[in-house]
Amino acid sequence: MRTLLAALHCPKGDVAGNLAAHLRLLTGAATAGCALAVFPEMSLTGSVDPATHPERLIGLDHPAVAALAEATGETGVGACFGIAERSRAHEPHITQVFAASGQLIGAQRKRHLGEGEEAFTAATHTVVFGHRGVTFGVAICAEAGLDQPFDAAASGGAELMLFPAAPGLYGRRTSEDSWRKGFAWWEGSALGDARRQARRLGLWIGLAGQAGATADEDFPGLAALVGPDGGVAARLPDWRPGVLTVDIPLAGSGVVSVP
């Protein structure tokens, strides 16, 4: 399954601008022959702290969510994208949405919150999705360090895990050296977790992370594909925004990074 993994710059609170970026990448994914596009954690809203900016939370019925879902029908590319969600019960969740064929298919809310995410509400349920004959689950950022999200998805038949992330770096990145150091930390953490989980369960894992500087926080990027043997099959080289297009051969015929 040809897949676009996006390391995307996602300004906080700029839903309209982020939607435009998603739509451009979805169109590009269609041109490249992709069946699926994977965007980072909270990609549509940008990273949100509900304690300080509750107005930046959006519902699953928000017009931008509907517009992106509609675009999956127009392009023929399924999209897994992130929002900071206000649920119908008015609870704040970190949520990864999956849309395909012009419809909102479902959503995976984050079950295990990371440091600094205490203002969000943790979910309890695991969702397994199907697309183009491929069954997949989602582990959101800090969840990749825990076995439970992967075990639950694998028990539901998942052969692919999507790993969207938005790990805010401590301290601002003011030089290339400081960006390099922040990226080195995330590279070791994210790929270390992905490689361990892939080997343990024989899964493909696709990573897509927020990249670049926002108003008050910086993100280390990285898009990568890890194979069932734990090897890094393809990846972006550094912290800068970019896209990685890969063929994920779930029938077992090898993997290529597509220029």
Predicted regions and their residues:
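Residue-level recognition of beta-strand->loop/alpha-helix junctions
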Residues: 7-9, 40, 109, 209
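Active-site catalytic loop in hydrolytic enzyme cores
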Residues: 60, 87-176, 182-192, 239, ...
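Extreme N-terminal starter segment of soluble prokaryotic enzymes
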Residues: 1-5
